[in-house]
Amino acid sequence: MKNGEILEVTVKEIKDNTVIGLVDEQNVYVRAKDISLLEPEKKYFGFLYLNRHGEWCVDTTIPKASLKSFGWGKVETVDHSSGVFVSIGLADKDILVSLDDLPDNSRDWPQVDDELIVRLERDNKDRLWGKLATDEDLISGGFISFDHKFKQNEMVSGHVYHLGKTGVFILLKEGRFAYLHHTEMEENVHLGQEITGRIIGFGAHDRINISLLKNAYARIDDDAAMILAAIKFTPDKKLLLSDSSTPKEIKDKFGISKSSFKRAVGHLLKQNLITSENGYLKIKS
């Protein structure tokens, strides 16, 4: 018998909540979502594993994460000396994703309750390890879907499955790849984290670009919003005011100081909402 095999077990005895089975003439514990459905002397297919007590068990609910397939695993424990332990659905066994397969900086590691997509790997000591999915694994594993039609500024959610040099890669709940550049996040994002962001573009290879920042209009302050509204409601979408305007002209128009005006205009320029040309402030087309 080997860890992670999917094989046939014969139920030998059912007593209270304990089910004993037989695999290759060796006793094993049999796990099931509903043991009342198990019958003595009947054969069942299941997933063979050594539990945390070193006992052989067969779970008749075969986990999606196996030696041949990828599935979701929920982080149960973080151990900075070894890695993170994830649950793949087994009642008394978590799977270790080694620190060798995790980011160098532990601040980028998954945290408890985060989710990872893993496949199992068995080493020469018959131990099971969790291996993280790549783009190719997600495609071949059937995680990708093109059913949903996304729109600009739509809010989407997903889990981080890979950290890149300039940003993070996400698998959306709708089954599409997404990318989050580091300039589009306000704080560190880590592996396995569930995030919700706004679509800001559509990149190559059907990958969606998202942002965790509020859109430009939501990020401007009251002075900037007042100036932007004034420009928008002029007939030709331009306002005869600029850095060269006098404090009195600015005060008469907006009731704010010139320094406040310059700060607000600078914010609007930085957000690419307006332009400043020939003494006019204009809505950027």
PLM-predicted stretches and their roles:
Residues 1-285:
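Single-stranded RNA-binding regions, centering on S1/OB-family and related RNA-binding modules
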